[in-house]
Amino acid sequence: GKNCTEEEVRTAIEQGTLMNYLQQVPVKKDDLFFIKAGTIHAIGAGALVAEIQESSNLTYRLYDYDRVGKDGKKRELHVDKALEVANLSSSAEPRQPLRVLKYRKGVASELLTRCKYFEVYRMLVNTERRQTVHYHADEVAFRVLLCVNGCGTISFEGGNITFYKGDCVFVPADSEVLSIHGQVQFLDVRG
């Protein structure tokens, strides 16, 4: 995007030209973007995302492409509130490069991004039928495992959970050591 003033954004919204101020970034499978809070952003058609964010129950809709809700009316915009917290200065492309992973005993892990609220790791597990990988939970915060490819099984004292692409597993804080096996790629979100 480019630097702009609050008034320029308001005018662009009224005239339907807000997209002229935004930086368009083509996306491809496995891309990672870290978008800081307050950054005006949109997700283009056809993109499937895993959106991990700081704990907040607020989303301000600044522009909505004139879409309508189930009631047939345009959805509510929150222009004033959004502009109070928006960062209107230009920024470099938020794409983060993925690094090459090295496998060790059936698992590879890399830190994808980190901020003061969370860390996101990419983990690849590739085990044979009788081989497992041990997973240690955090002592003070729960973790989220989001399966983004393949399938696997998590074993714990109380049983097993089989998970597939799109499934999410919450691991309570101070959990026992878990065993994971299968051929699976997941995001390990640590709060």
Q: What annotation goes with each model-predicted range?
A:
Residues 127, 173, 182:
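Residues on the solvent-exposed faces and adjacent turns
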Residues 177-191:
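Short, basic/aromatic-enriched C-terminal tail that caps enzymatic domains
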Residues 163-177:
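Low-complexity, intrinsically disordered Gly/Pro/Thr-rich segments
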Residues 35, 147-149, 179:
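Generic detector of intrinsically disordered, low-complexity, polar/charged segments
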Residues 1-29, 39, 43-151, 155-157, ...:
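Active-site region of the double-stranded beta-helix
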